[in-house]
């Protein structure tokens, strides 16, 4: 669930983006969706006249609905920013992503998916425990990094209880975090790397 501060930050980002586009002379319409209102909300917008800056991460009250929004935009032939629904769905399936990376020969930290909190075959510490089927860092806090088997079992139980899904356990790699964004369909333009600054985070 989003905290009020997160919602305010999101609104501030939307206002900054909107004012920047309006300053360049582009018409801007800010749309909020609730429940099944997206079809109705988009009905007044001609796909050939608008680009959707898709910042929707979830339909309120509908878990794992980010891909649903992208699918609806595609079904209406809207041009939109962000990943297609198939990619969004894959990104929420961390186990699938790990299997894919391994199959392509790309290095990835040691990992395992556990429905049993005892995780008898895990022996690599420190480790990080996260929900296996959630977006980005949902379910991750300072408690997610575990140093021994007792902490591991506690955190796996936390994932099971609070998210009702298996836990993904990985070898914890300490260090800096970078994001690399790409633009394009087919031929991709890679943007400069951006480092995440966590200095203001309490956990």
Residue ranges and their predicted role:
Residues 28, 79-80, 108, 127:
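Hydrophobic beta-strand scaffold residues
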Residues 85-88, 101-102, 139-147:
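Flexible, glycine/proline-enriched loop segments at strand-loop-helix junctions
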Residues 102-135:
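Rossmann-like NAD(P)H-binding beta-loop-alpha module
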Residues 1-79, 86, 90-92, 96, ...:
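ATP-binding N-terminal substructure of ATP-dependent carboxylate-amine bond-forming enzymes
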Residues 46-49, 71, 97-102, 127-128, ...:
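Short, hinge-like loop/turn segments at secondary-structure boundaries
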Residues 149-203:
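Phosphate-binding site of ATP-dependent enzymes
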Residues 127-155, 177:
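Glycine-rich phosphate-binding loop of ATP-grasp-fold ATP-dependent ligases
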């Amino acid at each position: 669930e989003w905290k009020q501060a997160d919602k305010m930050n999101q609104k501030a980002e939307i206002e900054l983006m909107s004012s920047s586009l309006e300053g360049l002379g582009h018409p801007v319409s800010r749309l909020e969706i609730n429940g099944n209102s997206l079809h109705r909300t988009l009905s007044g917008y001609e796909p050939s006249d608008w680009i959707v800056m898709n910042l929707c991460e979830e339909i309120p009250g509908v878990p794992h609905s980010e891909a649903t929004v992208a699918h609806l935009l595609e079904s209406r032939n809207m041009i939109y920013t962000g990943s297609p629904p198939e990619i969004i769905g894959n990104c929420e399936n961390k186990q699938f992503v790990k299997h894919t990376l391994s199959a392509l020969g790309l290095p990835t930290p040691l990992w395992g998916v556990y429905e049993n909190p005892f995780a008898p075959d895990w022996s690599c510490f420190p480790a990080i425990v996260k929900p296996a089927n959630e977006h980005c860092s949902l379910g991750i806090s300072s408690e997610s990094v575990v140093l021994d088997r007792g902490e591991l079992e506690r955190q796996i139980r936390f994932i099971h209880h609070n998210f009702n899904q298996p836990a993904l356990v990985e070898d914890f790699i300490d260090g800096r975090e970078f994001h690399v964004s790409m633009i394009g369909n087919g031929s991709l333009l890679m943007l400069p790397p951006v480092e995440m600054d966590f200095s203001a985070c309490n956990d």
